[in-house]
């Protein structure tokens, strides 16, 4: 396998890539970065976390998005595990990188020409330590198991920061709503929910919108859920106002980003947004409303 190596000062070199390279002496005091399968992997300066990552890599071969997310989180946890050996003893880190449940299912639907199309659906229920799973449903051709696991893994930490009792999960499909008629999107969403409804519920798993899944798609899914389960419960967030949705739901993520950033600036530097240069990536709901709030 081809890879490139970069050496940086003041770190330890470790062995990767099926033991092609051996651990080197501490005298070298360098860190190895291997570009492998599209992911830059840096050696973690903690033997326990290195072993955790190696197990994750072995269980999830080729899943570069998920592996990169796990690596970044493990890297940030180095000072935590050094101060809290009890977390290591209890196997907390080993457990948090492994999903509690992974669901993959077929989604057949009929297009406007009467032809049957088949997509793949996913729901990863990653961690429910503090509450029911919570995370969006992404509809995009790039969706695969690796992407959904990466998003679900990060959702654990995002949700825990809210202070609310909600766990982390994520779902989606490789269906592309772009260029599809309303009827085609509706039939896909109904088929998707016909299977997904077996695995979600107000006290179990509460999906939401994401890329490709707006109020229209959530509405179709919610209608199918009600039809099958005969329940009008809070099983999906992101619904329209006329059937149980929340005010300012569309703007909430972008606004929240600015509020959070404002508090961080205030906490760390005792400053405000005034006079700051703001760089925003993208042009979706988050970027648009973050731009709006930042200019205010």
Task: Give the predicted meaning of each segment.
Residues 140, 159-274:
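Glycine/serine-rich phosphate-binding loop and adjoining beta1-alpha1 elements at the start
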Residues 86-117:
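Structured beta-strand/loop patches that form or line metal/cofactor-binding pockets in enzymes
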């Amino acid at each position: 396998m081809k890879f490139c190596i970069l050496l940086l000062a003041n770190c330890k070199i470790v062995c990767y890539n099926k033991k092609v390279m051996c651990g080197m002496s501490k005298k070298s005091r360098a860190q190895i970065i291997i570009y492998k399968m599209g992911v830059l992997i840096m050696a973690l300066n903690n033997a326990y976390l290195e072993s955790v990552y190696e197990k994750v890599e072995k269980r999830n071969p080729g899943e570069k998005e998920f592996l990169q997310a796990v690596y970044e989180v493990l890297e940030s946890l180095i000072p935590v595990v050094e101060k809290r050996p009890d977390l290591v003893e209890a196997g907390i880190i080993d457990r948090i990188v492994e999903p509690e449940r992974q669901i993959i299912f077929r989604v057949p639907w009929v297009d406007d020409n009467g032809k049957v199309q088949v997509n793949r659906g996913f729901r990863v229920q990653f961690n429910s330590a503090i509450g029911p799973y919570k995370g969006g449903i992404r509809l995009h051709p790039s969706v695969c198991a690796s992407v959904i696991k990466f998003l679900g893994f990060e959702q654990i930490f995002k949700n825990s920061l809210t202070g609310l009792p909600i766990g982390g999960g994520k779902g989606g499909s490789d269906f592309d709503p772009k260029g599809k008629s309303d009827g085609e999107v509706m039939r896909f969403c109904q088929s998707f929910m016909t299977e997904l409804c077996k695995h979600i519920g107000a006290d179990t798993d509460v999906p939401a919108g994401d890329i490709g899944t707006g109020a229209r798609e959530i509405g179709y899914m919610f209608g199918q859920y009600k039809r099958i389960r005969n329940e009008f419960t809070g099983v999906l967030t992101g619904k329209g106002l006329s059937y149980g949705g929340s005010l300012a739901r569309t703007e909430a993520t972008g606004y929240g980003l600015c509020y959070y950033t404002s508090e961080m600036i205030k906490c760390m530097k005792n400053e405000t947004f005034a006079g700051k240069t703001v760089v925003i990536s993208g042009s979706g709901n988050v970027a648009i409303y973050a731009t709006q709030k930042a200019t205010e």
